[in-house]
Regions:
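Nucleotide and nucleotide-moiety/phosphate-recognizing core
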Residues: 28-115, 121-147
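Positively charged, low-complexity intrinsically disordered leader regions
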Residues: 1-37
């Protein structure tokens, strides 16, 4: 579904960079809607465009006073070109967010690990980061915001989001039987 929408946008002359900026801004609106007080934002980044969406959102939320931490599955140099261009030293990279001492306020984990092209089982490094997110949610009261789909939806160790922000449309897989455990509340980003 989403890939067809992106292809249509590209056919109209919209660039991938503009789509990423638009998606990131939409994620910002969702975070502001559910978490009105700035706190700590941990962005979980894969190497693809979902990471870029998360970085755009984090850049803007930082302006609101959010402290931004990053958990990376690959070094920034190994990210695709577009997300790599949004990465900067304003992201405090941490080795294990479970050991991080967060400032007062909400702790929001932004799931930018896997995008709409994922299927099958997650690789071990991604599964470990997804498990870390779930641990923080269960044991430290962190809140998970997924973008489009919770990473690994349908796989073991999938992210268990509190909110899934759907860019452009709600994907069919999000409303299938059993998905509610991972999807949480749905928020549409127009």
């Amino acid at each position: 579904q989403m890939q067809k929408g992106e292809e249509a946008a590209f056919a109209r002359g919209v660039s991938a960079a503009a789509l990423m900026e638009e998606a990131g801004q939409g994620i910002v609106a969702v975070v502001r809607q559910f978490y009105s007080i700035a706190g700590s934002l941990v962005i979980y980044l894969g190497k693809g465009n979902n990471a870029g969406d998360a970085l755009v959102a984090a850049r803007e939320l930082r302006k609101d006073g959010w402290k931004v931490f990053g958990r990376l599955c690959v070094p920034p140099a190994e990210m695709k070109e577009l997300p790599r261009g949004h990465f900067g030293d304003w992201v405090e990279v941490v080795e294990d967010a479970r050991k991080q001492v967060f400032a007062p306020g909400p702790v929001v984990l932004l799931d930018g690990l896997l995008g709409i092209g994922f299927s099958g089982e997650m690789k071990a490094d991604i599964a470990a980061l997804a498990s870390e997110m779930n641990d923080l949610r269960q044991h430290q009261h962190a809140h998970i915001v997924a973008m489009d789909l919770p990473s690994g939806l349908g796989a073991r160790h999938a992210v268990e989001a509190d909110v899934t922000a759907c860019v452009a449309q709600i994907k069919d897989v999000l409303v299938e039987d059993g998905a509610d455990r991972n999807v949480g509340r749905l928020a549409l980003v127009p």
